Structures are given as C-alpha cells and as structure tokens.
Amino acid sequence: IKDMVDKMVEDGIAYESQGATVVDIAEPTDTKELPPCIVRKSDGAALYATSDLATIVEREKLYKPDTYMYLADKRQELHFTQVFRTAKKAGIVRPDADMRFVGFGTMNGKDGKPFKTRSGGVMRLEHLISDINEVILNKIKENRSMTDEEADNISKIVGLAALKYGDLSNQASKD
C-alpha cells in the first residue's frame, strides 16, 4: 500500500492537503462537486479507499478483468466513485476500464435507521422469522378454529412466504 501511494505522489497524481495525501477526482463533466479521494491519512494510516485500490492493483496483476463490479450499500456510491476515478487516474487500470458500482438498500430497524452491523446491532434472521410466525399464529387463532399443530404449521409456511415476498418484491436499491 505504501509503495502504491508513494508512486501516486511521485507521478504527481496525489499530493498533500492538510497533512493527508489526496487525489483530485473531479472531472469537467461533473454536475456536482466531488471531494478528493484520501489515500493516506495525516498520521500515515491507510483507509478503505487505499485498501480497495490495493485490491484493484492485485486483481489487475492476477486476473486482468474486463469488468469490475462492486455491490455494496448505496450509501457507498461516493466512495466507489472516488476509488474508480483514482484507479484510472493513477494508471492502476486502463482509462476505459469498465468499473461499476451497484448500490442496494439497507435493512432498517423499527426506528427506520439502518442496522449497525459492526456493533452487532442487527436482528438475527431466526428472531425475525420467529416474530413473524408469532404474529401470524395469533391472527390464525383469532380467526380460525383448528388444532394448535395445524395453526403452527400454517403460520410457519405463511410466515416464510411473507418474508420472501417482502424481500423480493422491493427494488434492490430501496431501503
């Protein structure tokens, strides 16, 4: 990573700004202002962008792919725009390389905010299924007369179908 960033500086692609090493990624055709890509923090530490660029270097050496496709949370669009433009500007990939970002929506909690996966603040699938089954089981018991076993069986089938439908009926880019 250090060699990659040092080469960007030597080639005049990256420069120091407020102690950090950055690459300007703005293009004349941009309709909005894009901040530079930070490739090294002022304390010398690497960032996600730096790791992503190093990964692209490695993939170019090993595979020389025709297309790079990154699927991630849609909130990462700016990050990947910065990484892709830096990779092209630094000559890590050819200027016409096909680099695509596909953003998907987030799974949100009851508060409407995305789950915090790093801090473990997510609902486990088994708990979600259990909660759905419980709601459906209660509805069945309210409105139908059948054995507990039959009601439990139906709630599991309907619950799983509802979960699948809810997941697949939304556009991937929606939260």
Residue ranges and their predicted role:
Residues 1-175:
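Alpha-helical recognition segments enriched in aromatics with Gly/Pro capping
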